[in-house]
A protein has these predicted regions:
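Alpha-helical transmembrane segments and their membrane-interface boundaries
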Residues: 1-65, 116, 135-137, 143, ...
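Short, non-helical or kinked segments that cap or interrupt transmembrane helices
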Residues: 26-40, 62-74, 88-102
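Hydrophobic transmembrane alpha-helices of multi-pass small-molecule transporters
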Residues: 79, 104-105, 130-131
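Amphipathic alpha-helical interface segments
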Residues: 91, 105, 123
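Alpha-helical transmembrane segments and their membrane-interface exit regions
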Residues: 125-135
């Protein structure tokens, strides 16, 4: 993979992260927004690129397993997501934000292995769940909760 293709994938990571971040910051009003999501997606992409390409031609490395970096991304983003989950007056807050940060890292990993169509479709699905499903929950479940 040449530099231009890597730069294209990293740029797409920033773009797709911003798309999800815009929904979280400006539509949902959450504190984790465009910069956070763009950086999570970018970081996941670049670490995946490193795991794929960074050790090519290194024949003296024993037990090289590129999937270790992918596993590290999942764990690291889980730790980041745990930082946004809080307990406030017996109510857990931040679960959706944590899950969306974790999902966006998957988008970045998909880009890192070159699955651009999957990354775009995944981004669409994340925004759909956050925006449309969230709106439906507020509209119908919120009304149901007020009545009971």
């Amino acid at each position: 993979m040449d530099f231009l293709r890597s730069a294209e994938l990293l740029s797409l990571a920033i773009f797709l992260g911003i798309v999800v971040g815009l929904e979280r910051e400006y539509i949902a009003g959450k504190s984790a927004g465009t910069r956070t999501y763009a950086l999570v997606c970018f970081g996941s992409t670049i670490f995946t690129l490193i795991s794929r390409l960074g050790f090519l031609g290194e024949s003296n490395l024993q037990n090289l397993d590129p999937s270790r970096i992918a596993a590290g991304i999942v764990v690291g983003i889980g730790f980041l997501g745990a930082g946004v989950i809080i307990l406030h007056h017996d109510k857990v807050l931040g679960l959706t934000t944590a899950a969306s940060i974790w999902s966006v890292s998957g988008i970045g990993m998909a880009l890192g292995v070159g699955w651009v169509k999957i990354a775009f479709f995944g981004t669409f699905l994340i925004v759909f769940v956050l925006g449309i499903i969230g709106w439906l929950e507020k509209k119908f479940l919120g009304k149901y909760q007020k009545e009971n």
